From Swiss-Prot:
InterPro entries: Ribosomal_bL28 (IPR026569), Ribosomal_bL28/bL31-like_sf (IPR034704), Ribosomal_bL28_bact-type (IPR001383), Ribosomal_bL28_sf (IPR037147). Belongs to the bacterial ribosomal protein bL28 family. Coiled coil: none annotated. The keyword Secreted does not apply. This is Large ribosomal subunit protein bL28. The lineage of its organism: Bacteria, Bacillati, Cyanobacteriota, Cyanophyceae, Gloeobacterales. GO terms for cellular component: ribonucleoprotein complex; ribosome. The keyword Metal-binding does not apply. GO terms for molecular function: structural constituent of ribosome. One of its GO terms (biological process) is translation. Keywords: Ribonucleoprotein, Ribosomal protein.
Length: 81
């Protein structure tokens, strides 16, 4: 799987690490991704998704199906058996 949030699409950002002498080296700022098991009310089962911590906080305010619909995600593929 790619290092990308399934609901928000967050992924790594290209950045520089800058030393005191201002020498710059390219590096990646990785998104804080976590595998989460979330209860799906409509299907009555758990769904396992790779989410950013921002998406986990957003799930407290919005429904899982609303976010999945925006992302074009079919939750039936990620059902935990």
């Amino acid at each position: 799987m790619s290092r990308k949030c399934m609901l928000t699409g967050k992924k790594a950002n290209n950045a520089y690490s800058v030393s005191f002498s201002h020498r710059r080296n390219k590096r990646l700022q990785m998104a804080n991704l976590q595998w989460k098991r979330i209860w799906d009310d409509q299907q009555g089962c758990f769904v396992r998704l790779k989410l950013s911590t921002k998406a986990i906080k957003t799930l407290e305010h919005r429904s899982l199906h609303a976010l999945a619909k925006e992302a074009g995600l079919d939750l039936s593929k990620y059902v935990v058996k």
